[in-house]
Amino acid sequence: KSTIMNMLSKSEVFAENKLFATLDTTVRKVTIENLPFLLSDTVGFIRKLPHHLVESFKSTLDEVREADLLIHVVDISHPNFEEQYEVVEQTINELLTKQTEVQESQPWVKKRKGDNGKGKTEKTVAQLPRIVVFNKIDAFTYTPKEEDDLTPIKRENISLEEMQRTWMAKLHDDCIFISAREKMNIDELKSLFYNRIKSIHIQRYPYNDFL
């Protein structure tokens, strides 16, 4: 995540291939073509979060709740990347649901106006538009099966091209496959960001001629 932020914002956010290299939410201003926006780099998501990192994780949750667009970065070179993807989605849903339930139980919490004028505390993760970025395609490896091999196909037997077709068909959200380190498909990534953010901007400010 931090590598992608550094590349887009031309800043120097600490990036390391280890859990919790980012412990605080970092925000940078990014401009793609003529469109400026704020990009937040948050702490990574894992199952069974260590107690001493709970506060950092709460700050991440705050960023997710207030975001207009969620960028879910997945390390596709990891052998268990599909499980990691599901863990992140499940964790965000659980945390947002729990936080909303707590807030709704507190009568002094100021509620936002939702549909039909009813009180609505926070947006749910399902309402957040998102882009799934499969990173590290340069490190993706697989082992083709022999023609006479009748054993079931495993994850390590699936090529990157097959993986792309599968995930593009599976996800309702936009997804893209890149290598931040090798600068592969970065122009496509920027274009995708630009189009999605521009669409959000137009919906919010329909009479703004800025774009």
Residue ranges and their predicted role:
Residues L39, V73, V133:
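Generic enzyme active-site microenvironment
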Residues T42, I76, K136:
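Walker B catalytic acidic pair
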Residues K1-K10, P79, E83, N93-L211:
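C-terminal-of-GTPase-core extension/linker across diverse P-loop GTPases
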